[in-house]
Amino acid sequence: MKKWGVGFTLLLASTSILAKDIQLLNVSYDPTRELYEQYNKAFSAHWKQETGDNVVIRQSHGGSGKQATSVINGIEADVVTLALAYDVDAIAERGRIDKNWIKRLPDNSAPYTSTIVFLVRKGNPKQIHDWNDLIKPGVSVITPNPKSSGGARWNYLAAWGYALHHNNNDQAKAQDFVKALFKNVEVLDSGARGSTNTFVERGIGDVLIAWENEALLATNELGKDKFEIVTPSESILAEPTVSMVDKVVEKKDTKAVAEAYLKYLYSPEGQEIAAKNFYRPRDADVAKKYDDAFPKLKLFTIDEVFGGWAKAQKDHFANGGTFDQISKR
């Protein structure tokens, strides 16, 4: 027995010596803090069980466009989990991510979805019910800046798509509609969480154009006695995307764990965590379980209405694009 005990002790010691300590950096967009705090704990436990290795995931959050720029400029993110595919494409264009990144994971590397809704104050005093109510005189709108925020670009395109569908696809009328909406914007923060804080904490504005997950988080955390969610008649299907940063994981030798980290987002546990944090899950079984949590509405895609992100970025958000044109007061 003594001999067996010594051998077992040596086995434990050797296992402990072989276990690695790994660090990953996830550079993400603004309102995913709570999601990834929970997900990182779950993945670390999963990876420990699978491999014996200890993995610690650090998080960085900000406007999606600014976060992409930080990765382009050299911040050593192992993975990016950004608000939209264009921001990942921008990193890929600089050679830091494989240009075929979007095909590496299911659903075009978008493991969960969201949409754009309105958060209003209790009682809905300005009677906000749909996009057309946001252009009424005297309505103060809060939304982030599309130049820095991915969420803001989804907001803008959701409004534009609504205007197209209600004006026989007349682009000029859609531009007039979105221009009128932005004339009512009181504060343009750099990111979605900043806009939420402006509306919720600082008490500025009548309506916040928000990620659905951010609106649900605000009502659940701060109380339904203070805010209400208004789901418009139609909105855009927002598809946040994820990728490992090839140049970084090759340099740091973290490719295996970075790949596993992103793939686990599609697992039943990963999908459950996404749903609990008010993102719409891709997994059909998990989606069915949370069916009552997400209102039904007509959703259109960026490909259907805008011809994809590359075209939308060029037409609307590049220097001299329609956002710059409508921003001239």
Would you name each region that the model predicts?
Residues H166-S233:
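Ligand-binding pocket segment of bilobal, Venus flytrap-like solute-binding proteins
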